[in-house]
């Protein structure tokens, strides 16, 4: 959740041919991923999240619900005992921590390599500018691995998997090898979702921090 919150391009002739084929394959991967992402204008799902350290030791397990809507709207609710709500209205992101009775508001960073949640709700038409993308298909599952093209990102790699055309799971790996696995279930796409879903009313008396 934290990763989402803050939590995915003779010998000369042969060489030229290889580069051309590689570029063509990359373009196909980008096109496939873009089509799958843009296919779902809204997504509602439950999720379970597991965070592991580089050695495979479990650091945190959480569950929750999410709703996303293009362009740039998302709502993530992590269940107790580590309850949190993260909401984007397309302009700002509000993080609500009920235990602290504190809301943190910051401007939405629309860069895909800084806000992975926007893969599911943002503008992905220029996704190839942010990531090098490869894909692998196994039966009804399509896996995409996204590696940021710059170093100033929250993660080193992001894997996004689709089953029968719907989002199935995501995995983020950061610079120290920590892995965050998110499995979605009960996925519903292209349902009517009112924009009011993404308006968070801060409780009276709560601390408000604006960044």
Swiss-Prot record:
Cross-referenced InterPro entries: LolA/LolB/LppX, OM_lipoprot_carrier_LolA-like, OM_lipoprot_carrier_LolA_Pbac
Protein task: Participates in the translocation of lipoproteins from the inner membrane to the outer membrane. Only forms a complex with a lipoprotein if the residue after the N-terminal Cys is not an aspartate (The Asp acts as a targeting signal to indicate that the lipoprotein should stay in the inner membrane).
Lineage, opening ranks: Bacteria, Pseudomonadati, Pseudomonadota, Gammaproteobacteria, Pseudomonadales
Protein name: Outer-membrane lipoprotein carrier protein
Compartment(s): Periplasm
Family annotation (HAMAP family): LolA (MF_00240)
Gene label: lolA
Record Pfam families: LolA
Recorded GO CC terms: outer membrane-bounded periplasmic space
Annotated signal peptide: 1-25
CDD domains, per database record: LolA
The entry's keywords: Chaperone, Periplasm, Protein transport, Signal, Transport
Subunit structure as annotated in this protein's UniProt entry: Monomer.
Origin species: Pseudomonas putida (strain W619)
GO biological process: lipoprotein localization to outer membrane; lipoprotein transport
NCBIfam families per record: lolA
Family: Belongs to the LolA family.
Keyword Chaperone: yes
């Amino acid at each position: 959740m934290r990763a989402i919150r803050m939590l995915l391009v003779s010998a000369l002739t042969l060489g030229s041919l290889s580069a051309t084929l590689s570029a063509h394959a990359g373009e196909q991967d980008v096109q496939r991923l873009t089509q799958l992402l843009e296919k779902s204008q809204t997504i509602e799902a439950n999720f379970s999240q597991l965070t592991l350290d580089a050695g495979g030791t479990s650091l945190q397990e959480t569950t929750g619900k999410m709703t996303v809507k293009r362009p740039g709207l998302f709502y993530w609710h992590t269940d107790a005992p580590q309850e949190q709500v993260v909401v984007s209205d397309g302009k700002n992101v509000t993080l609500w921590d009920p235990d602290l009775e504190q809301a943190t508001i910051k401007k939405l960073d629309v860069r895909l390599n800084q806000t992975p949640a926007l893969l599911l709700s943002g503008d992905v038409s220029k996704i190839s500018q942010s990531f090098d993308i490869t894909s692998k298909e196994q039966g009804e599952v399509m896996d995409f691995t996204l590696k940021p093209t710059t170093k100033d990102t929250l993660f080193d790699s992001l894997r996004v998997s689709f089953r029968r055309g719907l989002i199935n799971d995501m995995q983020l790996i950061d610079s120290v090898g920590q892995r965050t696995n998110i499995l979605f279930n009960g996925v519903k796409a292209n349902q009517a979702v009112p924009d009011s879903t993404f308006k968070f009313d801060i409780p009276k008396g709560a601390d408000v921090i604006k960044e």
